UniProtKB/Swiss-Prot annotation:
Keywords: Glycoprotein, Membrane, Phosphoprotein, Transmembrane, Transmembrane helix. It comes from Mus musculus. The chain crosses the membrane at residues 62-82, 127-147. The gene is Tmem200a. It holds the Pfam family DUF2371. This is Transmembrane protein 200A.
């Protein structure tokens, strides 16, 4: 038992030692932290300035405050008179006489001394003194409360003004930041616009290359001289006058082929911004190859075998001036006087006999110019990489760079535009019958030329009629040459 008791006491001592060591470790571990934290004592915070309103004594509440103080002072004085201590007097004759004399003197002294003599040690003062003192204290407390409430209202108003001022300042700062950001964005936009101003130069070069393709030129060379550029611009203007004003102003400028007629003078005026065509034409031919766009449902006239064989010879022997000058119909300027219709229109129902010779010269060039739009001729002439010249052959109306006699429109199609063209579709068995005659196919007898001033609408009508008559008679001329006595069906 003694041994077991000794073992238990030893274990208890060991546990105490372990607990003491653990406590020492616990006490020692925060010591370095406290030692480290002692030099890093935080400085006392600066006193927070509390903004408060003023206590305005020059107010009704201030008046009542002063009144309460005075009433309480009067009450205190009344209580003092009532509770003032008394002294014991011995009654003697001498003293009585003396007292009587003194009373007479006091009566002669004044009202205040007599009031004190009467109310001193009186019960009224003992009762009214504390009552008046309480009334004065009550008035004082109420006036003080009202004064502090007014001060709190002023402090609230001051805080609200501070809040409003901070909000307004933040708003103005945000507006300034937004203005600065907008200014930077506008500056970036201005830089981009200045950078984009150089793009019309490339579009002009593309327009010259397109004009070279669609203008029936036999070579791909483009001279970099100023005279060639001006010639290309005048040709594009003359072709643009054939279009309606809406198409020439909006649609053509969107494609970027040539600038609108109104802006051509501006482009001439800015002659300082000339572009070098040698270095960009080769890249523009490959970069500006637009896909073939079909603007209307009009199909290209399919050439016959004989006409296909004659295309190469006609293209080699044809000159550029004859093909362009005989077919282009220029629009006279508004500043100049109107010229007679003989020099303006190649074919019209209201012109003189001199037009017939001009029409013959233009029709003599018809087969080559009409067959230039055929797929076979286009493939032989331009190859597979250049598809821009086909833009002029896929439109039934006046296209971008098309000659006046590129497409044929029949009289039946003019009368009935909704009829299907079976001879141009996949049904190859149907062909037109030329044996029958139609009064619409006959040429009208030309009238005598009359010099007359026409309006703009009449000029546009004359141009459209001349274009329709020229294409119709061109088709008639081709059909008469290709007729081989076969039976044809006509719708």
């Amino acid at each position: 038992m003694i041994a077991t008791g000794g073992v238990i006491t030893g274990l208890a001592a060991l546990k105490r030692q372990d607990s003491a060591r653990s406590q020492q470790h616990i006490n020692l571990s925060p010591l370095p932290a406290t030692q480290d934290q002692k030099p890093v004592r935080r400085r006392p915070r600066a006193d927070v300035v509390v903004v408060r309103g003023k206590i305005r004594l020059y107010s009704p509440s201030g008046f009542f405050l002063i009144l309460g103080v005075l009433v309480s002072i009067i009450g205190i004085a009344m209580a003092v008179l009532g509770y003032w201590p008394q002294k014991e007097h011995f009654i003697d004759a001498e003293t009585t006489l003396s007292t009587n004399e003194t009373q007479v003197v006091r009566n002669q002294g004044g009202v205040v001394v007599r009031f004190f003599e009467q109310h001193l040690h009186s019960d009224k003062m003992k009762m009214l003194g504390p009552f008046t003192m309480g009334i004065g204290i009550f008035i004082f407390i109420c006036a003080n409360a009202i004064l502090h409430e007014n001060r709190d209202k002023e402090t609230k108003i001051i805080h609200m003004r501070d809040i409003y001022s901070t909000v307004i300042d933040i708003h103005t700062l945000r507006l300034k930041e937004q203005k600065q950001a907008n200014g930077l964005y506008a500056g970036l936009l201005g830089d981009t616009e200045v950078k984009q101003n150089g793009s019309p130069c490339a579009s002009r070069l593309a327009a010259t290359t397109l004009a070279s393709f669609s203008g029936m030129r036999n070579s791909f060379r483009v001279d970099s001289s100023v005279e060639e550029d001006e010639l290309m611009l005048t040709e594009s203007k003359s072709l643009g006058h054939l279009m309606p004003p809406l198409l020439s102003d909006s649609a053509v400028s969107v494609f970027g082929l040539y600038p609108p007629p109104a802006k051509a003078t501006d482009d001439k005026a800015s002659s300082s911004k000339k572009c070098d065509t040698k270095s960009i034409v080769s890249s523009s031919i490959s970069a500006f190859t637009l896909p073939v766009i079909k603007l209307n449902n009009c199909v290209i006239d399919e050439p016959s075998i004989d006409s296909i064989t004659e295309v190469a010879d006609n293209l080699k022997t044809r000159s550029r001036n004859l093909s362009m000058d005989s077919l282009v119909v220029p629009l006279p300027s508004s500043g100049e006087s109107f010229q007679p219709a003989v020099t303006l229109l190649p074919r019209n129902n209201s012109v003189g006999e001199s037009l017939s010779s001009q029409y013959k010269s233009s029709v003599a060039l018809g087969p080559g110019t009409g067959q230039l739009l055929s797929p076979g001729a286009a493939r032989r002439q331009f190859g597979s990489n250049t598809s821009l010249h086909l833009l002029s052959s896929h439109s039934k109306s006046l296209d971008l760079d098309r000659g006046p006699s590129t497409l044929t429109v029949h009289a039946e199609q003019r009368k009935h535009p909704s009829w299907p063209r079976l001879d141009r579709s996949n049904s190859k068995g149907y062909m037109r019958l030329e044996n029958k005659e139609d009064p619409m196919d006959r040429l009208l007898v030309p009238q005598t030329a009359i010099k007359k001033d026409f309006t703009n609408k009449e000029k546009l009508l004359m141009i459209s009629r001349s274009h329709n008559n020229l294409s119709f008679e061109h088709d008639e001329f081709l059909s008469n040459n290709l007729k081989r006595g076969t039976s044809e069906t006509r719708f």
